[in-house]
């Protein structure tokens, strides 16, 4: 069966999500999920009907939250589908390329490689910012540039002046995609205000993180209407199931937004607690994080990761040497994780 698959697929290494990696324990801080399990109501009477391609209530609700026009919003099965749509819509297989800046989210390359689109990488600088000269030198045949801010796994914000420079150098050349999956934790750092000046800018959003709806798989692409209309040509006819649209709309209601903001305050306090506790440990560096996770460097990161794993505390090993990414959980989970790491190092 393997030999029947396309050559690109045969050579493909699948993205190792937290669930694929597995593990066994009672503290799960490896997927940047929210610890909050919120309840929603659902009307089961509509399940015999197909969903609308772009449910108006959901589109209007997210447009109001993001402070854009409804025609600037597209909803999809998570932000991952948004990534795939952008690559499929703007890149010719075996001709065009995407560009991204590791260390960063792994699905950009997977989405491109799956359909035979070349991937170009320009590593981030030592302080995890864009290497603009290297990016400019690599733009030949590049149709889509992906930038994650706050970046996963490093947690930092990409400098706004560098984003502006990138947008200027890619005018009439490529689409710039800002992955803002974690921007709800620092909305003042969003690039949504730049949509008015840059028609080649697209912004990815999700309800998986701050809204505590990772299992719902509901994401959004924000862009100018012309770009959104291109994506609507390639999206599936029923991308958002009826239950997803209904629950997501509830999450974006006045009451839902108030709950989300309260829970974000709780997570921010837990992040500060975890950061302060880890920083004082010997041989530990905690990088500033703007999302619901922290990147932590140890003298031997693999050893800490494995010891925690064996103890039922599931963290995320990082491709960055000796670094482990720790999602921010509830206070009990943070206390247990911090206590375990402290006992390992002292």
From Swiss-Prot:
The modification N6-(pyridoxal phosphate)lysine is found at residue 209. GO terms for molecular function: histidinol-phosphate transaminase activity; pyridoxal phosphate binding. It holds the Pfam family Aminotran_1_2. It comes from Aliivibrio fischeri (strain MJ11). HAMAP family: HisC_aminotrans_2 (MF_01023). InterPro entries: Aminotrans_II_pyridoxalP_BS, Aminotransferase_I/II_large, HisP_aminotrans, PyrdxlP-dep_Trfase, PyrdxlP-dep_Trfase_major, PyrdxlP-dep_Trfase_small. PANTHER family: HISTIDINOL-PHOSPHATE AMINOTRANSFERASE (PTHR42885:SF2), HISTIDINOL-PHOSPHATE AMINOTRANSFERASE-RELATED (PTHR42885). It is an enzyme of class 2 (transferase). One of its GO terms (biological process) is L-histidine biosynthetic process. It catalyses: L-histidinol phosphate + 2-oxoglutarate = 3-(imidazol-4-yl)-2-oxopropyl phosphate + L-glutamate. Pathway: Amino-acid biosynthesis; L-histidine biosynthesis; L-histidine from 5-phospho-alpha-D-ribose 1-diphosphate: step 7/9. Its EC number is 2.6.1.9. This is Histidinol-phosphate aminotransferase. Belongs to the class-II pyridoxal-phosphate-dependent aminotransferase family. Histidinol-phosphate aminotransferase subfamily. Keywords: Amino-acid biosynthesis, Aminotransferase, Histidine biosynthesis, Pyridoxal phosphate, Transferase. Homodimer. Its cofactor is pyridoxal 5'-phosphate. The gene is hisC.
């Amino acid at each position: 069966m393997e030999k029947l698959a396309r050559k690109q697929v045969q050579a493909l290494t699948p993205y190792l999500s937290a669930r694929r990696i597995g593990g066994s324990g009672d503290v799960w801080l490896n997927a940047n999920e929210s610890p909050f399990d919120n309840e929603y109501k659902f009307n089961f009477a509509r399940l015999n009907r197909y969903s609308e391609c772009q449910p108006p209530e959901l589109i209007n609700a997210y447009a109001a939250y993001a402070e854009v026009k409804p025609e600037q919003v597209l909803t999809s099965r998570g932000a991952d589908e948004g990534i795939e749509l952008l690559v499929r819509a703007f890149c010719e297989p075996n001709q065009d390329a995407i560009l991204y800046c590791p260390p960063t989210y792994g699905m950009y390359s997977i989405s491109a490689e799956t359909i035979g689109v070349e991937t170009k990488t320009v590593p981030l600088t030592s302080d995890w910012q864009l290497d603009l000269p290297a990016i400019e030198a690599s733009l030949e045949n590049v149709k889509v540039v992906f930038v994650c801010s706050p970046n996963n796994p490093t947690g930092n914000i990409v400098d706004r002046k560098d984003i502006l420079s990138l947008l200027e150098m890619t005018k009439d050349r490529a689409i710039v995609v800002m992955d803002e999956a974690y921007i709800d934790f620092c909305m003042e750092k969003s690039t949504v205000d730049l949509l008015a000046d840059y028609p080649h800018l697209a912004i990815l959003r999700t309800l998986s993180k701050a809204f505590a709806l990772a299992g719902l798989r509901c994401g959004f692409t924000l862009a100018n209407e012309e770009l959104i209309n291109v994506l609507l040509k390639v999206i599936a006819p029923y991308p958002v199931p009826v239950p997803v649209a209904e629950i997501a709309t509830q999450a974006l209601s006045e009451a839902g937004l108030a709950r989300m903001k309260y829970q974000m305050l709780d997570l921010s306090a837990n992040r500060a607690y975890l950061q302060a506790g880890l920083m004082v440990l010997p041989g530990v560096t905690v990088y500033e994080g703007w999302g619901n996770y922290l990147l932590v460097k140890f003298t031997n990161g693999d050893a800490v990761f494995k010891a925690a794993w064996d103890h039922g505390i599931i963290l995320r090993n990082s491709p960055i040497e000796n670094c482990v990414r720790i999602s921010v959980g509830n206070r009990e989970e943070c206390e247990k994780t911090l206590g375990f790491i402290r006992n390992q190092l002292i």
